[in-house]
Amino acid sequence: MATPKRRMSRANTRSRRAQWKAARTELVGVTVAGQRHKVPRRLLKAARLGLIDLDRR
């Protein structure tokens, strides 16, 4: 792992951290057993196969 050679100022640290933004999970519509649900894209296949209980929220 890379280690810094010098101490980074508080202002530089905070401005660097401020660039990072969390993105909301994109929800995709899927129809399972005649009902429409919105699930994250990474769970789309599992929802179609019935591996996820979509009624439980």
From Swiss-Prot:
InterPro entries: Ribosomal_bL32 (IPR002677), Ribosomal_zn-bd (IPR011332). Transmembrane segments: none annotated. SUPFAM superfamilies: Zn-binding ribosomal proteins. It comes from the Bacteria. GO terms for biological process: translation. Residues 1-20 are annotated as: Disordered. Keywords: Ribonucleoprotein, Ribosomal protein. The keyword Ribonucleoprotein applies. GO terms for cellular component: large ribosomal subunit. One of its GO terms (molecular function) is structural constituent of ribosome. Residues 1-19 have a biased composition (Basic residues). Pfam families: Ribosomal_L32p. The keyword Ribosomal protein applies. Belongs to the bacterial ribosomal protein bL32 family. This is Large ribosomal subunit protein bL32. It comes from Mycobacterium leprae (strain TN).
